């Protein structure tokens, strides 16, 4: 009650819903979207995750996910605006203490106009509504965690220079940051280079219970969450 930004809904008993199976759960997957720009390891882990879910009783449904291109592009300036507000007391007054990546994001946010911001908000709300409608036909949506295995430090060094790197990292996370959808990320295997690979289940707003149930059921019959990459 002291936090006016919170939602006054009761917290469910998540443990009570851990049935160990997924009977009666409809899981949607857009195979075109989840395969475009996704490497073989990430695609294989998603497919295997869906196979396990089906074995646990889930119904796998083919869906068409709303085109996320605009909201992915909007995520960067919107993030910049939010970060600029958070750092207003120290940026740009202490700009020389900031690294180039964060400074660049702050500059991007500060460069947006009120008109720019409102257009982003409208596009975000339209996309959020389209995803909400999709959840009238399925209980969960399955997507990769990112388009490739966990990147090495050497690969991450090119973060500001290789556009495909940031795109691959954010392709399957930005859309659900923009909709505010809850997700659970589950380890599902390893790439040939030893990097861990994961996939996600995405749920309806305030239906974290379904995500906890799905994650628990998956991890009861797999042991990827107990394995570690060779270091």
Task: List the model feature ranges, each with a label.
Residues 1-44, 48-49, 67, 221-231:
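A short helix-breaking turn/cap at a secondary-structure junction
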Residues 5-9, 73, 89, 119, ...:
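Short, surface-exposed loop/helix-turn segments at secondary-structure junctions
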Residues 16-31, 78-132, 144, 182-196:
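Short helix-loop capping/hinge segments that flank enzyme active sites or metal/cofactor-binding pockets
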Residues 32, 65, 138, 144-147:
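Short, well-ordered beta-to-alpha junction loops that form the rim of enzyme active sites
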Residues 40-64, 87-93, 117, 121-138, ...:
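Acyltransferase
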Residues 52, 174-177, 193:
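Hydrophobic/aromatic ligand-binding patch that stacks against planar heteroaromatic rings
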Residues 130-133, 163-187:
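Small-aliphatic-rich amphipathic alpha-helix that forms the alpha element of a beta-alpha
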Residues 195-204, 211-212:
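Short, well-ordered beta-strand elements
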């Amino acid at each position: 009650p002291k936090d006016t930004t919170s939602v006054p809904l009761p917290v469910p008993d998540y443990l009570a819903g851990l049935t160990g199976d997924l009977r009666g759960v409809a899981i949607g997957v857009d195979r075109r979207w989840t395969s475009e720009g996704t490497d073989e390891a990430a695609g294989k882990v998603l497919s295997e995750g869906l196979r396990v879910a089906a074995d646990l009783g889930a119904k796998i449904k083919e869906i068409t996910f709303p085109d996320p291109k605009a909201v992915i592009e909007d995520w960067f300036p919107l993030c910049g605006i939010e970060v600029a507000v958070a750092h207003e007391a120290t940026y740009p007054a202490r700009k020389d203490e900031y690294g180039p990546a964060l400074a660049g994001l702050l500059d991007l946010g500060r460069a947006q106009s009120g008109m720019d911001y409102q257009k982003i908000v409208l596009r975000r709300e339209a996309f959020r509504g389209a995803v909400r409608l999709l959840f009238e036909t399925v209980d969960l949506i399955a997507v990769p965690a990112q388009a490739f295995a966990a990147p090495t430090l050497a690969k991450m060094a090119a973060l500001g220079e290789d556009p495909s790197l940031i795109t691959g990292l954010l392709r399957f996370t930005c859309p659900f940051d923009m909709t505010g959808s809850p997700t659970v990320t589950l380890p599902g295997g390893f790439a040939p280079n030893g990097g861990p690979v994961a996939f996600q289940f995405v749920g309806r707003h305030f239906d974290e219970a379904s995500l906890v149930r799905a994650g628990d059921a998956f991890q009861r019959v797999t042991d990827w969450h107990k394995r570690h990459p060779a270091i």
